[in-house]
Curated annotation (Swiss-Prot):
The active site is at C333, H434. Coiled coil: none annotated. This is Cobyric acid synthase. The gene is cobQ. HAMAP family: CobQ (MF_00028). Pathway: Cofactor biosynthesis; adenosylcobalamin biosynthesis. The lineage of its organism: Bacteria, Bacillati, Bacillota, Clostridia, Thermoanaerobacterales. One of its GO terms (molecular function) is catalytic activity. Keywords: Cobalamin biosynthesis, Glutamine amidotransferase. GO terms for biological process: cobalamin biosynthetic process. Belongs to the CobB/CobQ family. CobQ subfamily. Residues 252-442 form the GATase cobBQ-type domain. NCBIfam families: cobQ, PRK00784.1. Catalyzes amidations at positions B, D, E, and G on adenosylcobyrinic A,C-diamide. NH(2) groups are provided by glutamine, and one molecule of ATP is hydrogenolyzed for each amidation.
Length: 496
């Protein structure tokens, strides 16, 4: 039997669609249904390497985790990775298709939509339920003629739609009513009801507005969801970095992550950010490095452009000074490339920061793979042989001309090989390994090593492991949906 589809759309970006879909996946997977997530087109710089070496949006990987199934390219057949003014890299079914400007991409969509629809068909053939996520808003007038991420999906699948509004940013009633007004009649007919998300305060104060929404649209407000604090779950958009981070308390380890304009896969740092005794913040000014015990130079979608940005901001000198003071500096993926001696792309060779004996060249082929292995000996006092796993997504290939490896890694069916580079003197290191801090033992030992180097007393972690924290939070969202919307109500919308 073909799976039933329920779609979650929003009145804006960051309304909470991704986590609501994740919660629905967990809620119904716990009840024994075969569940799959779906998002036809996703725009994000935080991506994920699937077990078969393909690339999808990070949110769909999280939703697959919530559903208890392996992530697959059919869950996110089209991924757009912004590259700045040039447009976006289009990743089709997990493989890079090319970089397209908006006008060219709109013409391409006529060919892409059948492929996205076929991916949804394959998911429906193997599942009982598919929970689909929209993108942005379904009522953007300038985008509607080319929108294959919202109502086009719902109409194709005959899916009921939950429309989510973010009350935290204000204007939720106007946004819900305005969205309904701008939809075509056949699209409005698919909307089963509304969800007000991220509410803080006394829900009784909302009653008049909720009643008005119901009276004006003929659809109920299905539930009001509170703002959830302390979630250990991924976000996709760098807008999520606004206001992130905290000031260190006495005895905390202060970690500064450089907020590159084209930062990618900053989900790498969520395990550190949510660790007790660690104060992680995102910085973009040289003076903000002064109080840091360690600095991380993260991944970038455009390494050379972000390297030029570092130099314009004076952060190149600040990072060299930081390293010269014997403080730990770690580069991941694009950050690793920037720490090296040179970066070559086409006929252009650009000097790196010169802190690691590494030369990088960019190539057309892209490496996308899940890997596992162990730590190498002698890096910052971190013990060798610690289990670690993660993934690589990069187009550059680096030649290491000295130093020592950070890890010994292997992909599926391969032996362990040296990976990354740590300077022989000082505490500068770099790696292509995304997700290394998800590994509890490595993260704990990395924190302990940096605390020692900073002269801070040891502080054992008393938290559950990061994976356990994620599972707890997915259950927390599922429980909230069951409480605030109701399982019977959701079953009715699904036709169960």
């Amino acid at each position: 039997m073909t799976a039933r589809v329920l779609m979650v759309q929003g009145t804006s970006s960051s309304a909470g669609k991704s986590l609501i879909v994740a919660g629905l996946c967990r809620l119904y997977a716990r009840r024994g249904f075969r569940v799959a997530p779906f998002k036809s087109q996703n725009m994000a710089l935080n991506s994920y390497a699937t077990p078969d070496g393909r690339e999808i949006g990070r949110a769909q990987a999280l939703q697959a985790e919530a559903a208890g199934v392996p992530p697959h390219v059919d869950m996110n057949p089209i991924l757009l990775k912004p590259t700045g003014e040039a447009g976006s890299q289009v990743v089709l079914l997990g493989r890079p298709l090319g970089v397209y400007k908006p006008a060219n991409y709109y013409a391409l969509k006529e060919k892409l939509w059948p492929l996205a629809a076929a991916a949804l068909d394959r998911l429906r053939a193997d599942a009982d339920l598919v929970f689909a996520e929209g993108a942005g808003s379904p009522a953007e007038i300038n985008l509607r003629p080319h929108d294959i991420a919202n109502m086009e999906v719902a109409l194709y699948a005959g899916a009921s739609v939950l429309l989510v509004g973010d009350i935290e940013r204000g204007g939720v009633f106007a946004s819900l009513l305005g969205t309904m007004e701008l939809l075509a009649e056949r699209e409005r007919e698919l909307v089963a009801g509304f969800v007000v998300n991220k509410f803080r305060g006394d829900e009784e104060l909302l009653r008049p507005g909720l009643a008005l929404i119901g009276a004006r649209t003929g659809r109920p407000v299905l539930g009001v969801l509170p703002y959830l604090h302390d979630l250990h779950l991924d976000e996709e958009d760098s807008v999520g970095l606004s206001g992130r981070g905290k000031a260190p308390a006495p005895g905390d380890l202060a970690v500064a992550v450089i907020r590159l304009p084209r930062i990618s896969n900053y989900t790498d740092f969520l395990p550190l950010e949510t660790e007790n005794g660690v104060a992680l913040c995102y910085v973009d000014r040289p003076q903000e490095l002064d109080g840091a015990h360690a600095v991380i130079l993260p991944g970038s979608k455009e390494t050379l452009a972000d390297l030029a940005w570092l130099r314009r901001r004076g952060l190149d000198r600040a990072l060299r000074d930081f390293a010269a003071r014997g403080k730990p500096l770690l580069g991941i993926c694009g950050g690793f490339q920037m720490l090296g001696r040179t970066i070559r792309e086409g006929g252009q060779t650009v000097a790196g920061l010169g802190l690691l004996p590494v030369r990088t060249r960019f190539a057309s082929e892209k490496r996308t793979v899940q890997v596992r292995g162990v730590t190498a000996e002698g890096v910052w006092g971190i013990p060798g042989g610690l289990s670690v796993r993660g993934y690589e997504i990069h187009r550059g290939f680096s030649e290491v001309c000295g130093g020592r490896p950070c890890f010994l890694l292997g992909g599926q069916g391969t032996g362990l090989a040296p990976e990354g580079c740590a300077a022989e003197e000082g505490y500068v290191a770099g790696t292509y390994l995304h997700g290394c801090f998800d590994s509890d033992t490595y993260r704990t030992q990395w924190i302990a090593a940096v605390r020692r180097l900073a002269g801070l007393p040891a502080r054992p972690s008393e938290q559950p492991g990061f994976a356990a924290r994620r599972q707890r939070d997915l259950d927390r969202i599922a429980d909230l949906l069951a409480e605030r919307i109701g399982v019977e109500r959701l079953d009715g919308i699904l036709g169960l």
